[in-house]
């Protein structure tokens, strides 16, 4: 799930933190990818007639199809991917996981009912909600990656946290995930939409944490407190606290401790904090996650030549893939992994730190942008109200 509405908060309040571009702009970069999130998206997206792809034996192949071709696309564009798999979830996450299982069970029942009485759209909608990544899916994907020569590592717990460690250490350029909580784990750069299909035509979003903090005017602790208040995987959200309210509360009070105190002392009792809401533990999980240091032997990785015959045996003979396409894909891997060895020119230069004067200028420009956006929003709202109040037939 990640952090609710965080991207909205960033795009509205720290727009300079987000760069949008094509996949080819990532040429020559090593990227740590949240494997479980990617596999889940493949199971949902790679479908035929509302159903997951299957071979003649009835085995699901959507995850393998997605992983094979999306990884090829990255390598074609000069990216060197490293996949990071989830380990055991933290205990604090068990409540959220239990809710997800319950929702999937409910969706499975609705899916069966929709097949009897609903439309095609209903069937597909409920079918997608039943999807979950199994241990077998993960093991098959690891086998495929090994045959492709693409490295992977297993995280002790949260994959996003391990990706962030590698990014901070400079072993990879960025962490890639759709989960915005990757920023809470202190990844300097987050890439979104990297594993999306080309057909979706979604730009790659590159989010820089230092610019997020600068744009919001927060340090990391305050930012993490904001994210917990917005709603994360570890805690139930506080009812009636939406994105704008969460941002205002954190800005007004400065920390979750003071926000909670203000809520409890509010004579109107506007907000009801859930009985079990251990926000300190949630914060600790973001600041001290169970991860391996970047120099740990299990965090060593390298890209190798693909095992062409192994790929044919696994995908063609075992899973019913087209042999021509698999061999063609293997040839692309062999060719493009060599191209990806080239370094980006930017790698030879260190960024120059901004002066206080430059920082003040950037902040002033950012505030002017926000003010202009607010003014336009008010003017648009006023124009809409006036348009509604005019009698019909008048210009």
Curated annotation (Swiss-Prot):
Positions of region (N-domain): 1-104
Record CDD domains: H3TH_FEN1-Euk, PIN_FEN1
Start and end residues of each stretch annotated as Interaction with PCNA: 341-349
Main location, first listed in the record: nucleus
Post-translational modification: Phosphorylated. Phosphorylation upon DNA damage induces relocalization to the nuclear plasma.
Binding note for cofactor: Binds 2 magnesium ions per subunit. They probably participate in the reaction catalyzed by the enzyme. May bind an additional third magnesium ion after substrate binding.
Stated name of the protein: Flap endonuclease 1
Compartment annotation: Nucleus, Nucleolus; Nucleus, Nucleoplasm; Mitochondrion
Basic and acidic residues composition bias: residue spans: 356-389
EC number: 3.1.-.-
Cellular component terms (Gene Ontology): mitochondrion; nucleolus; nucleoplasm
Region annotated I-domain, chain positions: 122-253
PROSITE patterns registered for this protein in UniProt: XPG_1 (PS00841), XPG_2 (PS00842)
Binding site for Mg(2+) 2: 179, 181, 233
Protein residues bound to Mg(2+) 1: 34, 86, 158, 160
Native source organism of the sequence: Uncinocarpus reesii (strain UAMH 1704)
Enzyme class, first EC level, given as a word: hydrolase
């Amino acid at each position: 799930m990640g952090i609710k509405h965080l991207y909205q908060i960033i795009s509205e309040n720290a727009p300079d933190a987000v760069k949008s571009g094509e996949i080819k702009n990532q040429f020559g970069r090593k990227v740590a990818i949240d494997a479980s999130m990617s596999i889940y998206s493949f199971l949902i997206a790679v479908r035929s007639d509302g159903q997951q792809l299957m071979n003649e034996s009835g085995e699901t192949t959507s995850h393998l199809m997605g992983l094979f071709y999306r990884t090829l696309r990255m390598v074609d564009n000069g990216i060197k991917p490293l996949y990071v798999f989830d380990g055991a979830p933290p205990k604090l996450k068990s409540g959220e996981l239990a809710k997800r299982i319950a929702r999937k069970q409910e969706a499975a029942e609705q899916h069966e009912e929709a097949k009897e009485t609903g439309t095609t759209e209903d069937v597909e909608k409920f079918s997608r909600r039943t999807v979950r990544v199994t241990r077998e899916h993960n093991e098959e994907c690891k086998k495929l990656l090994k045959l492709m020569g693409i490295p992977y590592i297993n995280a002790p717990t949260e994959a996003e946290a391990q990706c962030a460690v590698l990014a901070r250490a400079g072993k990879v350029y960025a962490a890639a995930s759709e989960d915005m909580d990757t920023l809470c784990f202190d990844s300097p750069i987050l890439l979104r939409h990297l594993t999306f299909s080309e057909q979706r035509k979604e730009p790659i979003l590159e989010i820089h944490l230092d610019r997020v903090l600068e744009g919001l005017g927060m340090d990391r602790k305050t930012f993490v407190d904001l994210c917990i208040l917005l709603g994360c995987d570890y805690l139930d959200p506080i009812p009636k606290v939406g994105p704008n309210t969460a941002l205002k509360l954190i800005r007004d009070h400065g920390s979750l401790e003071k926000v909670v105190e203000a809520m409890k002392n509010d004579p109107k009792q506007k907000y009801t904090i859930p009985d079990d809401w251990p926000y300190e533990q949630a914060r600790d999980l973001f600041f001290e996650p169970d991860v391996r240091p970047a120099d740990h032997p299990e965090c060593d990785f390298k890209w190798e030549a693909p095992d062409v015959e192994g790929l044919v045996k696994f995908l063609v003979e075992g899973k019913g893939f087209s042999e021509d396409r698999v061999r063609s894909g293997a040839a692309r891997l062999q060719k493009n992994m060599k191209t990806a060895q080239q370094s980006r020119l930017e790698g030879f230069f260190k960024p120059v730190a901004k002066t206080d004067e430059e920082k003040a200028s950037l902040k002033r420009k950012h505030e002017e942008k926000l003010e202009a956006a607010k003014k336009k929003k008010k003017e648009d709202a006023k124009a809409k109200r006036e348009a509604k109040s005019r009698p019909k037939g008048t210009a």
